[in-house]
Protein backbone atom coordinates (compact mmCIF):
# COMPACT_ATOMS: atom_id res chain seq x y z
CA UNK A 1 0.00 0.00 0.00
CA UNK A 2 2.37 2.90 0.74
CA UNK A 3 6.03 3.67 0.41
CA UNK A 4 5.96 5.82 3.55
CA UNK A 5 4.30 3.09 5.57
CA UNK A 6 5.90 0.24 3.67
CA UNK A 7 2.33 -0.68 2.93
CA UNK A 8 2.55 -1.05 -0.80
CA UNK A 9 1.01 -4.34 -0.11
CA UNK A 10 -2.22 -6.00 0.00
CA UNK A 11 -0.87 -9.29 1.12
CA UNK A 12 -1.94 -12.64 2.39
CA UNK A 13 -2.09 -16.31 1.96
CA UNK A 14 -3.83 -19.52 2.85
CA UNK A 15 -2.88 -23.15 3.06
CA UNK A 16 -5.32 -24.66 0.58
CA UNK A 17 -8.03 -23.85 -1.92
CA UNK A 18 -10.53 -25.30 0.53
CA UNK A 19 -9.63 -22.61 3.05
CA UNK A 20 -9.97 -19.90 0.41
CA UNK A 21 -13.38 -21.20 -0.63
CA UNK A 22 -14.60 -21.60 2.96
CA UNK A 23 -13.49 -18.00 3.71
CA UNK A 24 -13.04 -18.22 7.50
CA UNK A 25 -14.14 -14.62 8.02
CA UNK A 26 -17.34 -12.81 9.01
CA UNK A 27 -18.82 -10.43 6.40
CA UNK A 28 -16.78 -7.50 7.76
CA UNK A 29 -13.31 -7.55 9.33
CA UNK A 30 -11.82 -4.38 10.85
CA UNK A 31 -8.27 -3.60 11.94
CA UNK A 32 -7.22 -0.53 13.90
CA UNK A 33 -3.94 0.94 12.62
CA UNK A 34 -1.37 2.22 15.11
CA UNK A 35 1.87 4.11 14.53
CA UNK A 36 4.25 3.98 17.49
CA UNK A 37 1.25 3.15 19.68
CA UNK A 38 -1.01 5.97 18.42
CA UNK A 39 -4.23 5.14 16.56
CA UNK A 40 -3.89 6.65 13.07
CA UNK A 41 -6.58 4.88 11.05
CA UNK A 42 -8.36 1.71 10.10
CA UNK A 43 -8.30 -1.10 7.54
CA UNK A 44 -11.65 -2.73 6.69
CA UNK A 45 -12.22 -5.88 4.61
CA UNK A 46 -15.69 -6.97 3.47
CA UNK A 47 -16.69 -10.31 1.96
CA UNK A 48 -19.73 -10.95 -0.22
CA UNK A 49 -20.76 -14.10 -2.07
CA UNK A 50 -22.47 -13.70 -5.47
CA UNK A 51 -23.15 -17.08 -7.05
CA UNK A 52 -19.79 -18.74 -7.67
CA UNK A 53 -17.92 -15.48 -7.12
CA UNK A 54 -16.58 -14.06 -3.89
CA UNK A 55 -16.26 -10.27 -3.85
CA UNK A 56 -13.61 -8.92 -1.47
CA UNK A 57 -13.40 -5.18 -0.82
CA UNK A 58 -10.53 -3.53 1.05
CA UNK A 59 -10.64 0.03 2.41
CA UNK A 60 -7.76 1.61 4.31
CA UNK A 61 -7.57 5.17 5.63
CA UNK A 62 -4.56 6.45 7.57
CA UNK A 63 -3.82 9.98 8.78
CA UNK A 64 -0.68 10.98 10.68
CA UNK A 65 -0.61 14.34 12.46
CA UNK A 66 2.29 16.38 13.79
CA UNK A 67 1.42 18.87 16.53
CA UNK A 68 -2.24 18.62 15.54
CA UNK A 69 -1.62 19.28 11.84
CA UNK A 70 -2.09 16.59 9.19
CA UNK A 71 1.37 15.56 8.03
CA UNK A 72 0.51 12.49 6.01
CA UNK A 73 -2.60 10.87 4.53
CA UNK A 74 -3.03 7.49 2.87
CA UNK A 75 -6.24 6.04 1.41
CA UNK A 76 -6.63 2.76 -0.46
CA UNK A 77 -9.67 1.04 -1.98
CA UNK A 78 -9.66 -2.26 -3.85
CA UNK A 79 -12.24 -4.67 -5.19
CA UNK A 80 -11.31 -8.31 -5.90
CA UNK A 81 -13.39 -10.99 -7.62
CA UNK A 82 -12.52 -14.61 -6.85
CA UNK A 83 -13.87 -17.93 -8.10
CA UNK A 84 -12.60 -20.62 -5.73
CA UNK A 85 -8.94 -19.81 -5.13
CA UNK A 86 -8.46 -18.07 -8.49
CA UNK A 87 -8.37 -14.28 -8.77
CA UNK A 88 -10.54 -13.20 -11.71
CA UNK A 89 -10.17 -9.43 -11.52
CA UNK A 90 -8.94 -6.60 -9.34
CA UNK A 91 -9.56 -2.85 -9.34
CA UNK A 92 -7.63 -0.64 -6.91
CA UNK A 93 -7.12 3.06 -6.28
CA UNK A 94 -4.67 4.66 -3.85
CA UNK A 95 -3.90 8.19 -2.75
CA UNK A 96 -0.51 8.32 -1.05
CA UNK A 97 -0.03 11.80 0.41
CA UNK A 98 -1.18 13.53 -2.78
CA UNK A 99 0.07 11.04 -5.32
CA UNK A 100 -2.61 8.92 -6.96
CA UNK A 101 -2.36 5.36 -8.26
CA UNK A 102 -4.79 3.01 -9.97
CA UNK A 103 -4.44 -0.69 -10.78
CA UNK A 104 -6.62 -2.88 -12.96
CA UNK A 105 -6.03 -6.63 -13.34
CA UNK A 106 -8.00 -9.16 -15.38
CA UNK A 107 -7.52 -12.90 -15.69
CA UNK A 108 -7.05 -13.93 -19.33
CA UNK A 109 -6.36 -17.62 -19.74
CA UNK A 110 -3.21 -18.49 -17.80
CA UNK A 111 -2.24 -14.85 -17.24
CA UNK A 112 -3.17 -11.74 -15.32
CA UNK A 113 -3.23 -8.68 -17.56
CA UNK A 114 -2.36 -5.69 -15.37
CA UNK A 115 -2.56 -1.98 -16.13
CA UNK A 116 -1.30 0.58 -13.62
CA UNK A 117 -1.49 4.36 -13.68
CA UNK A 118 0.09 7.01 -11.46
CA UNK A 119 -0.24 10.77 -11.21
CA UNK A 120 1.46 13.12 -8.80
CA UNK A 121 1.62 16.78 -7.81
CA UNK A 122 4.03 18.92 -9.78
CA UNK A 123 5.25 22.30 -8.51
CA UNK A 124 7.40 24.58 -10.66
CA UNK A 125 7.70 28.22 -11.63
CA UNK A 126 5.64 27.53 -14.75
CA UNK A 127 3.08 25.03 -13.47
CA UNK A 128 1.53 23.90 -10.22
CA UNK A 129 -0.79 20.92 -10.55
CA UNK A 130 -0.80 17.26 -11.52
CA UNK A 131 1.40 15.62 -14.12
CA UNK A 132 -0.09 13.64 -16.99
CA UNK A 133 -0.88 10.02 -16.02
CA UNK A 134 1.96 7.53 -16.35
CA UNK A 135 0.41 4.30 -17.70
CA UNK A 136 2.22 0.93 -17.75
CA UNK A 137 1.21 -2.67 -18.35
CA UNK A 138 2.33 -6.02 -16.96
CA UNK A 139 1.54 -9.65 -17.76
CA UNK A 140 1.85 -11.98 -14.76
CA UNK A 141 0.97 -15.65 -14.18
CA UNK A 142 -2.69 -16.06 -13.23
CA UNK A 143 -1.58 -17.70 -9.97
CA UNK A 144 -0.02 -14.42 -8.75
CA UNK A 145 -1.62 -13.29 -5.49
CA UNK A 146 -2.46 -9.64 -4.77
CA UNK A 147 -0.98 -7.99 -1.68
CA UNK A 148 -4.29 -7.61 0.10
CA UNK A 149 -3.25 -9.37 3.33
CA UNK A 150 -6.45 -11.31 4.06
CA UNK A 151 -5.63 -14.41 1.98
CA UNK A 152 -3.34 -16.87 3.79
CA UNK A 153 -2.07 -18.34 0.51
CA UNK A 154 -0.20 -15.06 0.21
CA UNK A 155 2.31 -16.47 2.71
CA UNK A 156 3.20 -19.26 0.28
CA UNK A 157 4.17 -17.01 -2.64
CA UNK A 158 7.51 -15.62 -3.80
CA UNK A 159 6.02 -13.07 -6.22
CA UNK A 160 2.97 -10.91 -5.44
CA UNK A 161 0.95 -8.33 -7.35
CA UNK A 162 1.43 -5.02 -5.57
CA UNK A 163 -2.06 -3.52 -5.34
CA UNK A 164 -0.79 0.05 -5.03
CA UNK A 165 1.78 0.12 -7.82
CA UNK A 166 0.51 -2.70 -10.06
CA UNK A 167 3.96 -4.28 -10.34
CA UNK A 168 5.35 -7.63 -9.16
CA UNK A 169 6.83 -7.59 -5.65
CA UNK A 170 9.36 -10.35 -5.02
CA UNK A 171 9.59 -11.62 -1.47
CA UNK A 172 11.11 -14.25 0.77
CA UNK A 173 8.82 -15.52 3.55
CA UNK A 174 10.02 -17.20 6.75
CA UNK A 175 7.48 -19.04 8.90
CA UNK A 176 7.81 -18.72 12.66
CA UNK A 177 6.31 -20.68 15.54
CA UNK A 178 2.78 -20.28 16.95
CA UNK A 179 2.47 -17.52 19.54
CA UNK A 180 -0.23 -15.58 21.36
CA UNK A 181 -1.35 -12.41 19.55
CA UNK A 182 -3.32 -9.61 21.19
CA UNK A 183 -6.56 -8.50 19.52
CA UNK A 184 -9.26 -6.11 20.73
CA UNK A 185 -11.22 -9.10 22.04
CA UNK A 186 -8.40 -11.00 23.68
CA UNK A 187 -5.47 -13.18 22.73
CA UNK A 188 -5.45 -15.73 19.91
CA UNK A 189 -2.81 -18.24 18.88
CA UNK A 190 -1.31 -17.42 15.49
CA UNK A 191 1.78 -18.12 13.39
CA UNK A 192 4.07 -15.32 12.30
CA UNK A 193 5.27 -14.99 8.70
CA UNK A 194 8.16 -12.58 8.16
CA UNK A 195 8.59 -11.00 4.71
CA UNK A 196 11.78 -9.59 3.22
CA UNK A 197 12.72 -8.39 -0.25
CA UNK A 198 10.45 -5.89 -1.99
CA UNK A 199 8.06 -6.02 0.99
CA UNK A 200 9.23 -5.93 4.62
CA UNK A 201 6.64 -6.83 7.21
CA UNK A 202 5.32 -9.51 9.54
CA UNK A 203 1.84 -11.05 9.25
CA UNK A 204 0.15 -13.42 11.70
CA UNK A 205 -2.45 -16.04 10.70
CA UNK A 206 -4.40 -18.29 13.04
CA UNK A 207 -5.03 -22.03 12.61
CA UNK A 208 -8.04 -21.29 10.37
CA UNK A 209 -5.97 -19.16 8.01
CA UNK A 210 -7.37 -15.84 9.22
CA UNK A 211 -5.18 -12.76 9.21
CA UNK A 212 -5.13 -11.48 12.81
CA UNK A 213 -2.17 -9.07 13.03
CA UNK A 214 0.37 -7.17 10.93
CA UNK A 215 3.43 -5.02 11.60
CA UNK A 216 5.30 -2.85 9.12
CA UNK A 217 8.46 -0.76 9.42
CA UNK A 218 8.03 2.76 8.03
CA UNK A 219 10.94 4.51 6.32
CA UNK A 220 11.14 7.06 9.15
CA UNK A 221 11.87 4.31 11.68
CA UNK A 222 8.37 4.17 13.15
CA UNK A 223 6.42 0.93 13.57
CA UNK A 224 2.97 0.52 12.03
CA UNK A 225 0.77 -2.16 13.61
CA UNK A 226 -2.57 -3.60 12.55
CA UNK A 227 -4.70 -4.84 15.49
CA UNK A 228 -7.78 -6.97 14.81
CA UNK A 229 -10.99 -5.42 16.19
CA UNK A 230 -13.64 -8.07 15.41
What are these regions (language model features)?
Residues 195, 202-206, 211-220:
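Short, exposed beta-strand-loop hairpins at the edges of beta-sheets
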Residues 16-20:
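Sec/Tat signal peptide C-region and signal peptidase I cleavage site
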Residues 76-78, 101-104, 171, 199-203, ...:
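A structural detector for short beta-strand units
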Residues 25-116, 209, 214-216:
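N-terminal mature ectodomain segment of secretory-pathway/periplasmic proteins
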Residues 6-15:
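Bacterial N-terminal signal peptides
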Residues 24-26, 91-190:
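Solvent-exposed helix/loop surface patches that form functional interfaces
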Residues 1-4:
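Positively charged n-region of N-terminal signal peptides that target proteins for export
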Amino acid sequence: MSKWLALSIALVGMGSSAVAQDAPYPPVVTFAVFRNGENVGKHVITFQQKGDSRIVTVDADITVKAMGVKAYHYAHHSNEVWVGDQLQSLQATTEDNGRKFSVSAQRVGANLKVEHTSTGPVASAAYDGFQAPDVSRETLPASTMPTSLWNFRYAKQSTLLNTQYGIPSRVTVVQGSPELVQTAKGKVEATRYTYSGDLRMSLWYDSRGRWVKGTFAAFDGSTVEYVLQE
